[in-house]
Amino acid sequence: MKKIIAMAVVAAVAVSMVCAQITVGAKGTFGMNLGSKVSDEAKVLFSGNDDAKNAFMVNGGGSIYGRYNLPFLPALGVQLEFGLTANNGAGLKVEYEGVEMTATASYLSLDFPLLVTYDIPVGSIMITPMVGINFSVPVGSPKFVFKTDENEAAMDMGDLKDTGFIPGIVAGVEVGIPVGPGSITAGLSYVNDFTPVKLKSDGFDEKVDLLTRRNFNISLGYALKF
């Protein structure tokens, strides 16, 4: 009897796996730092003033993803993404020897969001709220730019090798419009990292907390369901 029950459970799971709805897609993103915080240590390092005001920056990137919906809960899904985001960062409005300038720090990251999604059909349009965790990994060296109305200069001030994985949360909503064999997707999302990227600056023995990323993103892509 136990064997029969076990076989029935395995068969039910197998059927569910086979019949599950799978979505794959790709999207490009464009956004800005909205709430990204430069640490007081970094403000002093770049401007000599921990009261320097933050400045806006824009970022861009793209990702591929897969979403898995079970037949007995067709609206509920789990989505795994792999993304690349360029120009994460923040800026400071500073004054140096009477000259006003903007100092920006930016970096490239690999992002791995794991999301719970919920599909809400509205006519032929699909609205999908989503929320989940994100793990980010800084890649390469950060870029530092000092810009005035007349000049712009880039500087190498260290690396982010000691940062490691950065945990965070991401939430948003996506709208899918059927076009051809799949759907054009447009979305809004907000990424909030929990810990800062750490700068190992030349000439300093200790690591410096550089900034904590908080990005608002707009996306446009295409998805196929199987």
Language-model segments: residues:
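Cleavable N-terminal export/targeting peptides
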Residues: 1-23, 226
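Short glycine/proline- and aromatic-enriched beta-strand/turn motifs that initiate or cap beta-hairpins
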Residues: 19-69, 223-226
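Outer-envelope beta-barrel architecture signal
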Residues: 20-24, 74-80, 123-129, 180-184, ...
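Gram-negative (and chloroplast) outer-membrane scaffold detector with strong preference
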Residues: 28-32, 36, 64-147, 224-226
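Extracellular/periplasm-exposed beta-strand and loop segments of Gram-negative cell-envelope proteins
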Residues: 34-57, 86-109, 136-166, 170, ...
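Membrane-embedded beta-strand positions in outer-membrane beta-barrel channels/transporters
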Residues: 59-65, 111-115, 170-172, 217-219
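Conserved C-terminal beta-signal and adjacent last beta-strands/turns
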Residues: 167-179
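A hydrophobic membrane-anchoring alpha-helix module
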Residues: 185-193, 223-225
